[in-house]
A protein has these predicted regions:
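Short secondary-structure boundary segments
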Residues: 46-47, 84, 106, 125-126
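A generic structural signal for short hydrophobic patches within well-formed alpha-helices
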Residues: 14, 49, 128-129
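Acidic, PIN/NYN-like endoribonuclease modules and their adjacent C-terminal/linker elements
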Residues: 1-6, 110-111, 115-140
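Helix-adjacent hinge/juxtasegments
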Residues: 55-75, 80
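Short, well-structured N-terminal submotif of metal-dependent ribonuclease cores
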Residues: 1-44, 57-66, 140
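Short active-site oxyanion
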Residues: 37-42, 76-78, 117-120
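Active-site neighborhoods of divalent-metal-dependent phosphate/nucleic-acid chemistry enzymes
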Residues: 2, 79-119
Length: 140
């Protein structure tokens, strides 16, 4: 079975890549280098972009947060816009999930990835076992 060349980028993947003092910075650099070399299609959503923007604005600098948005506009990263059915599905997932640690942003990310046929998430956070999604790992 062929491995899909689609990756969904989470907040932790972006933040660790941008923040040079982040403990996972070198790992995220390797992720993005690999994605470029192997010509992966990269996806993220508007909620994740807002979270990353707020992180950069508060933790690093407002001007870098603005530059981040400019870079996203010029990049090949596909931005997924959740519609009403995506939000309702995420809310149902959130309400029906057995763990109270699932956040709305994680639920919407899982729903959007599942509906777009994206099976791997680039993340350094715990990935809840939803819809058969898996965390991306660099091949050895």
């Amino acid at each position: 079975m062929a491995i899909s060349k689609k990756i969904y980028l989470s907040q932790s993947a972006f933040c660790s890549f941008i923040d040079r003092v982040h403990p996972k910075h070198y790992y995220s650099q390797a992720f993005f280098r690999y994605f470029g070399q192997e010509e992966y299609a990269l996806f993220t959503d508007t909620i994740t972009l807002n979270q990353v923007y707020n992180y950069i604005y508060k933790e690093i600098s407002p001007s870098l947060a603005r530059d981040f948005l400019k870079t996203i506009v010029l990049s090949n990263i596909n931005i997924i816009y959740p519609d009403q059915s995506d939000i309702k599905a995420a809310l149902k997932t959130l309400i029906g999930y057995q763990s109270s640690e699932l956040t709305f942003s994680d639920a919407i990310m899982a729903v959007l990835a599942n509906r777009r046929g994206i099976s791997q998430i680039a993340t350094f956070d715990y990935l809840h076992p939803l819809f058969g999604l898996s965390a991306f790992f660099l091949p050895i």
